[in-house]
Swiss-Prot record:
GO terms under cellular component: Gram-negative-bacterium-type cell wall; plasma membrane
Phylogenetic lineage: Bacteria, Thermotogati, Thermotogota, Thermotogae, Thermotogales
Record function comment: Catalyzes the transfer of the GlcNAc-1-phosphate moiety from UDP-GlcNAc onto the carrier lipid undecaprenyl phosphate (C55-P), yielding GlcNAc-pyrophosphoryl-undecaprenyl (GlcNAc-PP-C55), the lipid intermediate involved in the synthesis of various bacterial cell envelope components. The enzyme is highly active when tested with C35-P, instead of its natural C55-P lipid substrate, suggesting that at least a 35-carbon chain is required for the lipid to be a substrate of WecA.
A GO molecular-function descriptor: glycosyltransferase activity
Protein's recorded name: Undecaprenyl-phosphate alpha-N-acetylglucosaminyl 1-phosphate transferase
Length: 291
């Protein structure tokens, strides 16, 4: 409980400091928000975890990516640099933690964990495009795998991040949450990337869909745009309804992963198809479908 109180207080203080120092996420052609917002939520969560979870290995492995995200917030780093550093952290984790990597029980080479980790951390970053979405997804995910301090740290930040957000997570926050929950999920599922993927099913769906969508229209798959699921949904039905719907889908994916039933992958595919169909209906509108 103290984590929530401290996180709330830190967010308040850091928000004031960010405004005075002009450390703000300003609107531009790549972003959907219409005003400058302090991107210090990740910093407040990090400092809270530093107090309560400094010996937690998942937190320790997340520190380099938190710093990477903070530098990205400050200097807008190249995606190549971010991919390289994320891959190095994945290699570090895979060599430091003695678990056998598998997919639904079938053992695989550890290099697949590196690929999976890089993709998942970037998936969390992609999902952080709607007020409260990544925070809500991460809150339920952390609760379900017993990461209590992380959950309470998010709870303290969440009131600042709900629509219309007064404070953003920033890339420092999305990278921190992505690294922490990816590593924690893999260990929770004893190295099984299949069940970890089901558990973190919404970020995984969004990164795969975004990648394929851009390739179909012959665009750089790493280039940002405003055609993600949360962007299209929020433009048509509003931020709050979108937030409730997508967090609910993420919660269902969490439960599918926790079940550890192989055949639940079919339910996952069905739910993804529902998301995709709804996306196409909303995106089509009165004209042609635009990916």
């Amino acid at each position: 409980m103290w984590e929530a109180i401290i996180s709330f207080f830190l967010t308040s203080v850091l928000s004031v400091f960010a405004k005075k120092t002009e450390f703000l996420d300003r609107p531009d052609s790549r972003k959907s928000h219409g005003r400058a917002v302090p991107p210090v939520g990740g910093v407040s969560i990090f400092l809270t975890l530093l107090i309560f979870e400094r010996d937690n290995p998942f937190f320790l492995f997340s520190i380099p990516l938190f710093l990477l995200g903070l530098l990205d917030d400050l200097f807008d780093l190249s995606y190549r640099i971010k991919l390289a550093v994320t891959a190095l952290v994945a290699v570090w984790f895979s060599t430091a933690v003695t678990i056998e990597v598998s997919i639904f029980g079938a053992r695989i080479h550890p290099v697949f964990f590196v690929i999976w980790f890089v993709g998942m951390v970037n998936a969390f970053n992609v999902v952080d495009g709607l007020d409260g979405l990544l925070s809500g997804i991460s809150l339920f995910s952390s609760l379900m795998i017993g990461e209590r301090s992380l959950a309470f740290s998010i709870i303290g930040f969440l009131p600042w991040n709900l629509p219309d957000a007064k404070v953003f997570l920033g890339n420092s926050g999305s990278f921190l949450l992505g690294a922490y929950l990816s590593t924690a999920s893999v260990v929770f599922f004893e190295g099984d990337l299949g069940y970890a993927t089901l558990f973190l099913g919404f970020p995984f769906y969004e990164i795969v869909f975004s990648f394929v969508r851009r390739l179909v229209v012959k665009k750089n798959p790493f280039s940002p745009d405003e055609k993600h699921t949360h962007h299209v949904f929020s433009r048509k039905i509003g931020k709050w309804k979108t937030l409730l719907i997508l967090v609910s889908f993420s919660l269902m994916f969490n439960l599918l992963g926790l079940s550890q039933k192989f055949y639940f992958i079919f339910l996952y595919v069905v739910l993804c198809c529902v998301l995709l169909f709804t996306y196409c209906v909303l995106q089509r509108g009165n004209g042609n479908l635009k990916l």
